[in-house]
């Protein structure tokens, strides 16, 4: 009798354990074809992936507390970090394990980028909602990832061309990416373009359209950060919008203050 009870309990655990696993909501990890017609009504996990904490005003210490005369508030720190090892299995609202990573040094950064995505899993990845909540409490922007990998890592120029699709003169994915960011409560996107197959002027137009939608909708804080493995600033990209930033290639260094007017900076 006892053996039968143990067997029954084991079977119930397997059945309901599988059901619980099937019901676990996950964060977005998409290819372009899955984003084109995205809406919260058709995405069963959308409501679990929303940040509800507004972006706080960033604290600035008094001038007298500056470390030296060359320290300026205009200089910002962006933390591009792996918040979860695989974007396709990132839980929407935390988990009972230590796989996820949550920064605790918010005072030392101004922007958080979810470093994620792969050719096999997905290349369009919104940041985890709990990470955005935590970032916003400290006035830190939270950016999702759009990753066009190099050919050696499965890069496909067809994804680039699809992302830059125009209909009636408008970049349809710029609009959709804005809708996703607005609904999920984060602050824009990091575009990692290492697949080729496009021009800087095309992406500048894409960025302009994204920010025009955000500005018109009262979300003028939103931004796109650009990376294409270049070690030099791109005037074409940086002049797209006042919020646009660029991640220079690793190891790049130099003083670009003399190019401020060319880069649309003040």
Question: Residue ranges of each PLM-predicted region?
Answer:
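Chitinase-like catalytic core of GlcNAc-active glycosidases
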Residues: 70-263
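Bacterial N-terminal signal peptides that target proteins for export
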Residues: 1-8
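Bacterial N-terminal signal peptides
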Residues: 8-17
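Intrinsically disordered low-complexity regions specifically enriched for long asparagine
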Residues: 17-19, 252
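Compositionally biased, low-complexity repeat tracts
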Residues: 13-14, 23-24, 184
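N-terminal module-boundary/linker segments of secreted carbohydrate-active enzymes
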Residues: 22-96, 100-102, 106, 216
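Basic/polar N-terminal segments that are highly enriched at the extreme N-terminus
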Residues: 1, 19-22
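Glycine-rich, aromatic-lined ligand/substrate-binding cores of catalytic
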Residues: 266
């Amino acid at each position: 009798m006892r053996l039968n009870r143990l067997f029954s309990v084991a079977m119930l655990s397997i059945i309901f354990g599988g059901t619980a696993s099937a019901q676990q909501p996950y964060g977005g990890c998409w290819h372009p074809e899955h984003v084109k017609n995205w809406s919260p009504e058709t995405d069963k996990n959308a409501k679990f992936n929303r940040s509800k904490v507004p972006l706080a005003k960033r604290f600035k210490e008094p001038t007298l507390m500056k470390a030296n005369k060359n320290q300026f508030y205009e200089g910002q720190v962006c933390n591009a970090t792996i918040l979860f090892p695989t974007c396709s299995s990132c839980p929407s609202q935390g988990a009972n394990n230590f796989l996820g990573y949550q920064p605790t040094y918010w005072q030392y950064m101004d922007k958080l980028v979810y470093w994620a995505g792969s050719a096999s899993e997905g290349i369009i990845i919104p940041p985890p909602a709990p990470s955005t909540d935590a970032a916003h409490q400290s006035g830190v922007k939270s950016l999702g990832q759009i990753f066009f990998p190099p050919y050696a890592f499965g890069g496909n120029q067809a994804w680039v061309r699809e992302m830059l699709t125009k209909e009636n003169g408008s970049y349809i994915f710029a609009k959709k990416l804005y809708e996703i960011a607005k609904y999920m409560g984060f602050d824009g996107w990091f575009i990692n373009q290492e697949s080729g197959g496009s021009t800087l002027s095309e992406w500048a137009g894409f960025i302009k359209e994204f920010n025009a939608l955000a500005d018109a909708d009262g979300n003028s804080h939103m931004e796109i950060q650009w990376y294409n493995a270049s070690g030099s600033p791109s005037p074409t990209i940086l002049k797209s919008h006042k919020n646009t930033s660029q991640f220079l290639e690793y190891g790049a260094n130099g003083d670009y203050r003399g190019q401020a007017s060319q880069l649309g900076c003040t």
